């Protein structure tokens, strides 16, 4: 399943993983993956900036504290749904 920005808006409105960082989201292998806004990502030439969504425009930003690798949004949503069932 290919997610779109509206799913991210839903997750953000649910106030999941909120903190003060900016995050970048990119479609990788049909999954939206979120990265912290580390300077090294801007410097990597294999990342076309036009392929990224800057979440800074939203009021609340995903908090993937401690992760430098991409996090698949579908995994975050699955974890959230499991938490809701408990």
Predicted feature locations:
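Surface-exposed ligand/attachment interfaces on beta-rich extracellular proteins
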Residues: 6-18
């Amino acid at each position: 399943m290919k997610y779109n920005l509206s799913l991210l808006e839903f997750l953000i409105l649910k106030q999941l993983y909120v903190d003060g960082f900016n995050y970048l989201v990119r479609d990788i292998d049909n999954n939206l993956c979120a990265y912290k806004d580390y300077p090294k990502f801007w410097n990597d030439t294999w990342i076309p900036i036009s392929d990224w969504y800057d979440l800074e425009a939203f009021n609340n930003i995903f908090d993937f504290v401690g992760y430098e690798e991409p996090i698949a949004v579908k995994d975050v949503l699955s974890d959230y749904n499991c938490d809701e069932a408990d």
